[in-house]
């Protein structure tokens, strides 16, 4: 899990995550900025044993929000072109906030998305369970996200949370692979929605 360390609710969230993992007979794995996360875990689990590991195979990309607002530069050329194609094909598409009242729409899309994938392996089942846990505790986890849609057609959804003062982590992006440019459109729309404190 990637958890919002600066949340005042973190002390309540971690035991719930640990319980969920025990029920699944899996260890509780936390991902984040190595030094900061280690300090927080040491404070919250003062009398517990834990192992910290830093592996570059688990590292994520870090982008300035401005890059996703504009998609400028050679590295983002492909995303920019796909985003333009999406906007041309779906000029009335909108990105609405994910919240407890719109989560049912995202859940319905998610079920279709998994059905389109065919057989569910352990990884997809764990991912689906994590997304559903996030939906159930949306406000507790202080998540921010949205649904990309046009009329009654949902093209995808995305969400994440702040993991440091000015850093926002995207936890999930799910889009219809048959809709050209849906993934870049989600990324741009989320970047536009983020509070100014995230850079």
What are the residue ranges of the model-derived segments?
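Conserved donor-binding loop and adjoining core beta-sheet/short helix segment
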Residues: 1-36, 149-178
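Conserved acyl-CoA
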Residues: 14-25, 185-198
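Short, glycine/charge-rich beta-strand/loop segments that flank catalytic centers
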Residues: 26-45, 56-59
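A structural signal for short, well-ordered beta-strand segments and their strand-loop junctions
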Residues: 27-33, 62, 94-98, 147
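Acyltransferase donor/substrate-recognition loop-hinge adjacent to the catalytic core
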Residues: 46-119
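Active-site rim helix/loop that mediates acceptor-substrate recognition in acyltransferases
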Residues: 123-142
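Conserved beta-hairpin
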Residues: 135-136, 142-156
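Short glycine/threonine-rich catalytic loop with a Thr-x-Gly-x-Asp
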Residues: 179-183
């Amino acid at each position: 899990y990637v958890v919002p360390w600066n949340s005042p609710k973190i002390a309540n969230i971690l035991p719930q995550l640990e319980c969920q993992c025990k029920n699944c007979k899996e260890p509780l794995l936390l991902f984040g900025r190595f030094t900061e996360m280690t300090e927080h875990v040491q404070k919250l689990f003062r009398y517990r044993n834990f192992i910290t590991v830093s592996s570059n195979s688990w590292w994520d990309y870090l982008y300035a929000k401005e890059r996703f607002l504009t998609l400028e530069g050679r590295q983002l050329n492909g995303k920019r072109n796909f985003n333009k194609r999406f906007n041309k094909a779906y000029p009335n598409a909108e990105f609405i906030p994910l919240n407890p009242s719109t989560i049912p729409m995202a859940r319905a899309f998610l079920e279709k998305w998994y059905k389109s994938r065919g057989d569910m392996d352990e990884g997809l089942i764990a991912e689906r369970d994590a997304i559903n846990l996030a939906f159930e505790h949306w406000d507790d986890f202080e998540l921010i996200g949205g649904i990309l849609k046009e009329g009654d057609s949902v093209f995808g959804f995305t969400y994440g949370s702040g993991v440091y003062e000015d850093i926002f982590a995207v936890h999930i992006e799910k889009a219809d692979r048959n809709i050209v440019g849906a993934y870049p459109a989600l990324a741009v729309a989320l970047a536009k929605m983020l509070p100014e404190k995230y850079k």
